[in-house]
């Protein structure tokens, strides 16, 4: 999983871009976490708790995206994917799941979060 972090010098906005099949992670980092160090640290602490066996799983529901963690992996997905549809959408109208959902290993997410934390901290 490859990623790149940038900061817009004019607006001060932090942006994360992730490799194909993980694009939604970039959106989650940029929009749901943003430059909030306390929120980033909270997720890192939860990952440590899961790795230590203190928790089995954890969920963080954001404005547009949700993070699910368990002992093996992280899943980030658009909140719209979590709802069952009462009717069938036309094929051309269906959500493009690859850009709305991604899985990665817990350790991979932890590494990316640590890098994001350092990037944001240096940019202040």
From Swiss-Prot:
The protein's matches in Pfam families, at most eight in alphabetical order, are given as: UPF0231
Note the superkingdom of the native organism: Bacteria
Q: Which InterPro entries match?
A: UPF0231
Q: Which family does it belong to?
A: Belongs to the UPF0231 family.
Q: What is this protein called?
A: UPF0231 protein Shewmr4_0656
Q: Which organism is it from?
A: Shewanella sp. (strain MR-4)
């Amino acid at each position: 999983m490859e990623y790149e972090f940038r900061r817009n010098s004019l607006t001060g906005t932090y942006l994360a871009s992730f490799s194909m099949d993980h694009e939604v992670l970039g959106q989650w980092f940029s929009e749901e976490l943003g430059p909030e160090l306390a929120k980033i640290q909270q997720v890192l602490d939860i990952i440590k708790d899961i790795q230590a066996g203190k928790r089995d799983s954890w969920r963080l529901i954001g404005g547009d995206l949700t993070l699910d963690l368990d002992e093996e992996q992280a899943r980030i997905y658009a909140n719209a994917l979590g709802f069952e549809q009462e009717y069938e959408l036309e094929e051309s109208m269906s959500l493009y799941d690859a850009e709305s959902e991604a899985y990665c290993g817990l350790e991979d997410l932890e590494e990316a979060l640590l890098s994001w934390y350092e990037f944001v901290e240096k940019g202040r």
